[in-house]
Amino acid sequence: MDISPFASPLYLLAKPAGARCNLACKYCYYLEKGKLYADRPTEVMSEEMLERFVREYIGAQTMPEVLFTWHGGEALMRPLSFYKRAVELQQKYAGGRRIDNCIQTNGTLLTDEWCRFFKEQGWLVGVSIDGPQEFHDEYRRNKGGRPSWAQVMRGIDLLNRHGVEWNALAVVNDFNGDYPLDFYHFFKEIGCHYLQFTPVVERGQHHADGRTLASPTEAGEGGVLDFSVSPEQWGRFLCAIFDEWVREDVGTYFVQLFDATLANWVGQQPGICTLAPTCGHAGAIEWNGDVYVCDHFVFPEYKLGNIMTDSIVGMMHSERQHAFGQAKRTALPGQCRG
């Protein structure tokens, strides 16, 4: 069996609009990343950079399938023409490989035109929605402080009307974490069969550039932030949903964490880095070509390089990236290891 690093797909999550977003969710870990580029706060990925990324990314793959993931910030802050150009470039450089695309959105900017494109091109759409209105609107508001749930539901309705494949990404926090079954039943009621639950846990740390979240190398100031879900909450949340899911919904509704745990249990790859013994195969690329070790580690000390001067293969298979991935096995307490 080939266990070399090149036996696994090489993966970069792309941020074509950087940290730009039309919402200002209180718990967002990425919104403040724009301060890393404070001298160019309104910049987005240029067409030149897009072509460089598509060409280099496809060329770096050793597998017959290539997955592009478009993320944010809010990925729809780039116009539809940008993604149409991305598809043209993917076709130009595919070299016989199959190209798949998925895109993560808060759902508020979806239109008929966007949905027609996603349907025609076979894109998978991930929608960020934190359950029923009273849960979602607690933290997911726009920059003027207005709630966003109604706009998200309008976007989901458009996806359904156009027959676009979509799944939900829901953040579990201190507020909604106490209502697991209300949360779960909501997604069943709106016909969402693929769910990803993400616990939010952030620590505060003030930086000279205005950022307020601690990086993994920093101790943090005053413990976790108030919107964070507690360990006990998260455990009760998962157990309550699992007890219903395992009795009624296996094979009908797919909860990423449960499926990944089952895969681990039977000796298969879990498919998500949090349950794997090591990580490091999934980096992130910012609008200007900067590459970081991981989407959740976009901090200056975790920058690997830039695709205008460094190869994707060289960065993602570097000793530094390997050490980052192995640290999950060597540096974490035993209880936290995959």
Q: What does each model-identified segment do?
A:
Residues 1-116, 121:
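Conserved alpha-helical substructure of the radical SAM core
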Residues 20-31, 293-296, 333-338:
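Local cysteine-cluster metal-coordination motifs and their immediate loop/turn environment
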Residues 55, 59, 77-195, 203-204:
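Conserved AdoMet/S-adenosylmethionine-binding subsite of the radical SAM
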Residues 140-150, 157, 161-274, 278, ...:
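Radical SAM enzyme [4Fe-4S]-AdoMet core and its adjacent flexible, acidic
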Residues 270, 298-338:
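Membrane-interface junctions of multi-pass transporters
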Residues 286:
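Short, acidic, Ser/Thr-enriched surface-loop or helix-capping motifs
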